[in-house]
Amino acid sequence: MAEVTDDEWKDLLNLIRKLEMCLKSVFSADLCNWSCLMNSFFKEPEPCPHLHIHVRPRYRNPVVINGNTYSDDSFGHHYSTKKSAPISIEDMQAVFIRMKSWLNS
């Protein structure tokens, strides 16, 4: 991460702000956890490390998508890397469409 230029940091900050606003506006996320895990690249015989960032929106209250309720049972704590219940393809598509609509507005 130390190799990221000042201009790249500014661009990244703008993307982070926009994505957080989207998640808070569209799904009422209370906050977002961000992570950058570089060690996975070194599992390969010829690693090609690059900046790879994950965002995990966190929710105090359940979120309803297409009538299905999703709860963040570990809100306020570290989350497990194991998914307790996968999101359906239909709900995943609804999330994508709603976020895309907000980001393009």
Language model: regions and residue ranges:
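HIT superfamily nucleotide-processing domains
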Residues: 1-105
